[in-house]
Amino acid sequence: MNKVRISAFHVVFFIFIVSNVGGALTPIGDPPLFIGYLRGVPFFWLLERVFTSWLVTAAAILAVFYCFDRRSFARMPRAPRADAEQADTWRFEGGINILFLLVIIGAVFLPDTFFLREAVMLAAATTSYFLTPKTVHAVNSFSFGPIKEVAFLFIGIFTTMMPALGYLAVHGVEFGFTRPLQYYFASGALSAVLDNAPTYVNFLQLAESTARAANPAAFAGAAVGSVAAVQILLVQQPAFVVAVSLGAVFFGAMTYIGNGPNFMVKSIAHDAGVHCPSFFGYIFKYSLPILLPILILVGLLFV
């Protein structure tokens, strides 16, 4: 494994790929898409439309990671390199948690009645915690510290960002967004510096308002922000929804605060003794020179 040579860039590329870009296909991959699913976007709707752009983005990031990793390995002193090349022995414990993971995934498809979905997810997570042997938690350095840290941070972010997003919801149509690429870069820019989940919701609302203004007859009888209105939007302007989805998910990787899991990964890695870039080091050393050009190119090619 990589435990003898894990570096800051391993954490960064994990955030790029696993916490963000990798989850762009379905609602269980990233929080914004799950919110879209709750608002009326069918589960596999996005998968059918973004697979190529997702594949190109992920492949480009993985190619850059491969170059980083090869260079890092080549620069290692001989003794650590010999340790890294030796076959590791490992064992799999806590297999019961696969069952609970499947329960949580299955709960996504439950009807939203009396918070049944959320109750099943919470029950599965709680049961998993108490049934997992404490030795497994100890070996994996499990603690609630990163979860608490992220919770407090994003309470502050949500509190301060709501006025800006509220203004966007009311006056967004005045900006004249009429092309998918505008939605891609605008939702991406805000997702990079704010949390991408509420940003997605606001731009989905903006897309609906724009489409409603262009063709009010198509939205007749559908309340603003309703499931019916979102489903009409999927027919009238599917490219807008694709652009907002990709912008929110992809650009959420630009900073630690762009997506909730980003900061959690950083906190877990830090607690495990792994060196992580600072907030601005992450941006100026990795996301701006590496990720941003890839996302711009993908937007120009596919959105």
Q: Which functions belong to the PLM regions below?
A:
Residues L101-A211:
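Transmembrane helical segments that form the transport core of multi-pass membrane transport proteins
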Residues A60-P111, E118-M121:
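Long, contiguous bundles of hydrophobic transmembrane helices that form the permeation core
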Residues I61-A82, T126-V136, A151-I157, A164, ...:
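Predominantly late transmembrane helices and immediately cytosolic-facing juxtamembrane segments
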Residues I15-A24, A82-T89, I98-L99, I147-M161, ...:
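Small-residue-rich segments of transmembrane alpha-helices in multi-pass membrane proteins
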Residues F43-S53, D88-F92, F109-M121, S141-G145, ...:
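Interfacial loop-to-helix junctions that mark the boundaries of transmembrane helices
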Residues K3-F9, F13, L25-T26, I35, ...:
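Juxtamembrane and boundary regions of transmembrane helices in multi-pass small-molecule transporters
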Residues M1-I6, H10-V18, I35-F51, M162-M254, ...:
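Membrane-interfacial helix-loop connectors
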Residues D30-W45, I104-F115, L301-V303:
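Transmembrane helix-loop junctions at the membrane interface of multipass transporters and ion channels
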